[in-house]
């Protein structure tokens, strides 16, 4: 039986790089994959998964109203798929996570999801919440805090690198807006305000 995987990490841990490597491994063996990324992420061109080290691949952009089941099933009928890979999985909604589980269960296609576990306020994203709840396999991708400890938190900062405590859960950004920290330094930075 195919499995639903959730690979989670803080910012700058190499989630997209890992996804692109997994995609390459499948394709190198002549297997068909289908890649998705969040349409809300506009750091690069829409419908492109790009890693900080320069690797990239085309992907289907998903939105709040997207039916991943319909898209995957339609593609699978045309050309049998061997793996589905989802970048920015924290932006999935509950229904989409359950659609991905159905892809595993009914179509027997493994689904590999990569995303953040928590936001800048240490709150779960909707997609992450349901992936943590129903994924068959959970794996943490390690990142490093400036102190050398494991980074598990995402600190949002302003243009002067000052910590931000409040705001919308979703604000797209990279190294200019977020710093991956260990829990200790995350709390220290927030308490320094």
Swiss-Prot record:
It is found in: Cytoplasm. GO terms for molecular function: ATP binding; thymidine kinase activity; zinc ion binding. The keyword Disulfide bond does not apply. The active site is at 88 (proton acceptor). Zn(2+) binds at residues 145, 147, 182, 185. Homotetramer. Belongs to the thymidine kinase family. This is Thymidine kinase. It comes from Zymomonas mobilis subsp. mobilis (strain ATCC 31821 / ZM4 / CP4). The gene is tdk.
